[in-house]
Amino acid sequence: MTLDQKGLKKRSVTVAYFFNNIGKKHDIRLRRMNTVDEQERRIFERDLHRPGLALAGFTNLFTYKRLQILGNTETRFLNHLGEEERKAAFANLTRFKVPCIILTSNNKLQPELLDMATAAGIPVYVTRQSSTKAIYLVTDFLDDQFSLYQQYHGSMVDVYGVGVLLTGKSGLGKSEIALDLVERGHGLVADDVVVIRRKGETMQLSASRNNIIDHFMEIRGLGVVDVKANFGIRAIRDVKEVLVVVELLEWNKEMEYERLGLDTKTIRILGVDVPLVQLPIFPGKNITVIIEVVALNFLLKRYSNYVAAEALTDRIKKVIHNDDRTAGDILV
């Protein structure tokens, strides 16, 4: 099985989408300073720019496609100029197709500069946040928007706080297992279509649902189940980090399966290696409980560096090498 498909990436986001959504995910409130067509302006990069040199007249390397931040330094510079000089300096911004301008620390633009931005179709916003915090929050939001992502067939469940991705051929019962885990008190992130993102250069993968399918599940023989309506808000999760992948396999008596758990397998998703557990399916096997144990084993290894197979192996080695014991003692 391979999940290392080439990641997709947004080319741009509209300024309208940015304005309408950043406040939902981050502690930053933007207020409009003018009225222009926000749908027409697009943001192409996650990085921001403070246009101090551009305002001073040096525009050779002006990264105008980035969102522009005007903080205390930039606004004070403009304010200390005469009216004509101020207009000339601000024209170094408005003659480019800048996505939008954000004024931090509740700074203001002179009315004539605001009119210039409006005439150029540049949205202008203001926030009470400092430049440092605003840059951090806006960059984090855009990092999410421009992150690598891919859609996978499977189910994503939060088991004891561990994000477990269930994969395998269609018809093996991934949705039924996910539903059983929800009934046992765990949380459903997504079923059937799982959207996985890798943020920036981090080694973290986050999984979320497809917005159309939402938290609905299709159970063969039963039909569509609304997990949120049936089990309540405690049964769903919006986003969860992918920490373990469980691949469900059809039972094959000719195949050799892992028995001790000493060999750690991994699978690559969007360039990140994730622990992999392969579970054969056959009648009478309680997969739900086994997946709970998979999650608990992961927590034991992460926080206590404890692996049951290694502990048992060490114990047997100590007994075998103990000269004071007899072969009979070993079997007792």
UniProtKB/Swiss-Prot annotation:
Enumerate the InterPro entries for this protein: HPr(Ser)_kin/Pase, Hpr_kin/Pase_C, Hpr_kin/Pase_Hpr_N, P-loop_NTPase, Ser_kin/Pase_Hpr-like_N_sf
Annotated positions binding Mg(2+): 175, 218
Broadest EC class assigned to this enzyme? transferase
Write down the superkingdom of origin: Bacteria
Q: Which SUPFAM superfamilies match?
A: HprK N-terminal domain-like, PEP carboxykinase-like
- Region annotation (Important for the catalytic mechanism of both phosphorylation and dephosphorylation) maps to 217-226
User: Any other noteworthy remark?
Assistant: Both phosphorylation and phosphorolysis are carried out by the same active site and suggest a common mechanism for both reactions.
Q: Per its UniProt record, what PANTHER family does this chain match?
A: HPR KINASE_PHOSPHORYLASE, PROTEIN YJDM-RELATED
Q: In which family does this protein belong, per the annotation? A: Belongs to the HPrK/P family.
Q: What is the protein name stated in its UniProt record?
A: HPr kinase/phosphorylase
